[in-house]
């Protein structure tokens, strides 16, 4: 809501500065976004009267004028504006004046004619008004008056960002009421008396949807001069509120909306066939709107119609064929209360957003319509003339809102505010806000005023008391609470440690949406029904994810399309698994996932560029697993996964259970996602790896370590990791490490077999190992793998 400070002060004028005013209303919950001057910086500009206006003898487009600015002599001024004419009241920049941009007015000669000043346009004075030529002031503008004072240009516009619950402040009336409450100042509304009817013309009003329109007022005004000029004071008030002047009738309805908070509309009476009918639209009924667009109406849209056709979308937008035009003689003024539930969302469904719909869908004061009708009639007669008919009203009292009655407990107020405000102050604040207050045993019973739709529960009253009392007036008091030491579980592996490790290995953390495209998800996790959202952001984000892999693959595609071929990403997040036995039928499992694609390392002149493969990702994942309590107990077993390459996929195993998966993305999936090149992913259950070994101090052996390499021939289908793990178990305390360093298949190795070269590191903490000790340990290892896997030492 943008408004003029000077207009507000016509209603309520507390003894505070502009800065104090904006701070005050911000602290009261009406956040001020911006404060701007209504005009540029200038001085020396006066109201003038063009006494003479003649053609310049040497220039077709210039006029020579004599202008009265209230001084002893008339000023000779040369003007190039086409609308300059004798008798016009104008804004005159006299010699010595300074205009915006530090432009100084001096005596000059234009084509040989003296010019001692300048006749100004709006733009030349930094006033944001679209116009051609110089300003045309009202005939009663006082000659010689300082122009800044004449238009009250020592003013600012204040832009307030109103929350959806404060619809009562979408008007000068509402803002003045709020400022008056904050300052205990009287609010003076303009005097509006009932306009006496001079003709008896009426129109029938048939409200067929009383729940949507409990009150509808109509009044005929005949012989209206729509060619009249909107007074400059009204144009300025509209401009400072962000609304441009259109014609006097529209300007008046806009003015009443801004001043009173009641949207209104004016119809051309000659274009109405029969009477007014307020009804729901027929499905696909068509209406041409004021902007020339055609709307195909839905059956839940309330319309204002006559006996033959729809005239306007109620509370939203008028129709082109019933609006006021330059040929209009008689008008029908409309003033109604539309139920917010029947207006909310209608404008948006037709791609519209209007000042009227914004107010009606939040709630307009349902006691305001008669006063607003009289105010609009008063202004219309003053500006455009006309013969006024009586007001015709159609009302359904049963469908009008009922004032909310809300109980406020003393105990609840003190608990939420943390401060005891005296009873008398609480009552005074609520009454200043327009509420009727009754004292009860536990506190108070307050009846909300007709303009406050947002007062519905006890907390609303607490908020009102708190903000008017002033949150800054509530003393600071530190909460008193016992400090309990939280137990620190050293065995828990911090997520930050894993994040740091992956970042150190060249990964970047990604955060993708938990909402995914359901059909695409079926490619990654087929055969599992995901939770479908009843009200999704979009169709592409309508399912809860079953895996983090989908989001990471889409992120890879996003980066590849932006010339980022090397991608290394990881993500920690939840997956959502339907489970009838779980709370709310859904298991939320924390997962850790990663993806790599592109070159193995950054491009370098001294390094060969190679593409990542399965073992790059496996190495990174093993580094993560090494941090955990079972770092040596994890294994990788070949598996089949619908999203992964059939020959390059493995299940991550621990204690005989699969806790994750790693592998190269299936070529068909690469094609459907639009991936460019080989992409490797992993996903693992976080709860299965989030423990670590508690560090224990131990002596470091001072005796030498011994390495022995063995080559074992085993069946080709036996996993290398199983062989290495068997070596570790059989080696006992002397075996410090066992590492696979070569796999050979070919000449010298029987077909269907493979040779595994394993480095064994043996060491004792008590003594130097003898050759016999080493040989015995190696022999025990060979016998163990031979018995378990049929392995044999390679010759």
UniProtKB/Swiss-Prot annotation:
Reaction(s) catalysed (UniProt annotation): tRNA(Phe) + L-phenylalanine + ATP = L-phenylalanyl-tRNA(Phe) + AMP + diphosphate + H(+)
Gene Ontology annotations for the cellular component aspect, listed alphabetically: phenylalanine-tRNA ligase complex
Gene Ontology biological-process entries: phenylalanyl-tRNA aminoacylation
Record-listed Mg(2+) binding positions: 454, 460, 463-464
Domain tRNA-binding, residue spans: 39-148
Cofactor, free-text remark: Binds 2 magnesium ions per tetramer.
Cofactor annotation: Mg(2+)
Keyword Transferase (UniProt): no
Family: Belongs to the phenylalanyl-tRNA synthetase beta subunit family. Type 1 subfamily.
Subunit structure: Tetramer of two alpha and two beta subunits.
Protein's name according to its UniProt entry: Phenylalanine--tRNA ligase beta subunit
Gene name tied to this protein: pheT
